[in-house]
């Protein structure tokens, strides 16, 4: 693992050195509440197919067009915790989806209104959204939901809806899109999109805090998972084994990409 990381660092250094010959200066600008930002704590950032930057804060959803910020209200939601935006994504049909503290929302672009979707089924926090074409994978506090062809399917990793492993924090697909990987607060799970089979792996057996996976991403045949107490750990998909990566100086990882 260390040799792989050194190799990647070397590639990046070579690329940077080459680019410096024709490098253009980057311009940074901060967007603050005086610009219209609804809150200083930004939990999610997403760039849509039209080039808009969507910002999910503790107070709702904002859109930044490069000049100004427009705020979108969650109508009927008063509590700050319930307003908190956890995730944003867009399906191929240009539908923008938002997960917040109480459920799933969709933006009606024509009317610029946020509409709550299937509240009778998804009545809990939505922590992760993953779009694949027009299919939407929804990770919630009470399991996985899949919206496809107008149908909503619910999958639970445990029959007990309140089990910790049903708290899904992040999602990603494998390379051939046949398996969906779930980062939960109690282990790593896979869900076969072919036959519905569910498998699980634990970083450290009988050590619950070591299995609190906050986020994940995939590079080739390796998953990288951010934890709440163990830093970044990797999972070799073919070998089905965990390993530590190099120390980052902090063991609490809130996001990874």
Regions found by a protein language model. Give the residues of each.
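Carboxylate-rich, polar loop motifs that coordinate divalent cations or form catalytic acidic clusters
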Residues: 1-257
């Amino acid at each position: 693992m260390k040799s792989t990381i050194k190799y990647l660092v070397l590639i990046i250094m070579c690329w940077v050195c080459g680019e410096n010959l024709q490098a253009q200066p980057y311009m940074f600008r901060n967007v603050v509440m005086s610009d219209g930002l609804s809150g200083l704590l930004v939990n999610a950032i997403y760039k849509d197919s039209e080039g808009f930057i969507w910002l999910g804060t503790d107070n709702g959803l904002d859109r930044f067009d490069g000049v100004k910020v427009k705020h979108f209200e969650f109508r009927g939601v008063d509590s700050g915790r319930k307003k908190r935006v956890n995730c944003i994504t867009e399906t191929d049909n240009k539908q923008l989806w938002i997960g917040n503290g109480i459920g799933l929302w969709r933006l009606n672009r024509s009317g610029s209104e946020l509409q709550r979707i299937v509240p009778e089924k998804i009545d809990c926090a939505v922590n992760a959204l993953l779009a694949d074409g027009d299919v939407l994978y929804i990770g919630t506090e009470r399991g996985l939901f899949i919206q496809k062809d107008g149908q909503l399917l619910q999958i639970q990793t445990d029959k007990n809806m309140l089990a910790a492993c049903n708290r899904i924090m992040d999602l990603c697909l494998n390379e051939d899109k046949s398996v969906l990987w779930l980062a939960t607060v109690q282990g790593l799970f896979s869900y076969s999109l072919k036959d519905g089979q569910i498998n699980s792996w634990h970083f450290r057996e009988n050590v619950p805090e070591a299995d609190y996976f906050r986020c994940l991403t995939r590079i080739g045949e390796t998953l990288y998972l951010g934890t709440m107490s163990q830093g970044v750990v990797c999972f070799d998909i073919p070998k089905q084994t965990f390993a530590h990566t190099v120390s980052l100086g902090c063991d609490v990882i809130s996001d990874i990409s």
